Structures are given as structure tokens and as C-alpha cells.
Amino acid sequence: MSVTRNFFLAYITTKNEEEALNIANFAVEKNLAACGNIFPKMKSIYKWNKKLQNDDESLLILKTNSSKYPLLKKLIIEKHSYEVPCILKIPIDDGNKEYLKWINDSLI
């Protein structure tokens, strides 16, 4: 099993913990993510329509592999409340091989 380019973290910001939980539950239930981690409260500072925003958001991190990521991204876009959701695909360059095997086995 090659680690490079096979496993990914999906980094997603959501409007609140409930939205993150809904997306995570659905993704894991549909075997598109092995697991999700939710950071319930963080502060996000950004510009939207040229206006400075300072919002409370939640962070959702989902663990997946290359074959499941396209469907996972599609699901997030469909379930997300934002007009332009933050969805970032972060490659996992290395990790505990047993854990990475568990990710793969969980996505079957």
C-alpha cells in the first residue's frame, strides 16, 4: 500500500458544530470518510464581497483515500450551507501504516 498520494485529509469549515456533525455523520455512514474530527469553535477572519468578516465557525477534518475523495467533495458541496464552502484536500505524506490500513478498510 503506497502512502504517497493515496490518503487525504479533507479540511472543511462550517457555520457551526451541528453542520459539521451532519456532514461527518453522513460521510462516515456512506463510507466516503473513515472518520471525522470536529473542532467546534474557531474564529475565521476573511473578506467576502470586499467586506471584512470576523465569524465563529467550526472545523471538520475528514480522513479519506483517493478513490473516495471525489464523491466526498460532491457530498460536502451538496450538504453545505455556504455559497462557496471551504473544502481543501490535504495529502497525507506519511503515517502509522496500521492506521492507514484501517482508513482503507473502513471505506469498503
Spans of features found by a protein language model:
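Positively charged, small/polar-rich N-terminal and surface patches that mediate targeting and assembly
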Residues: M1-I108
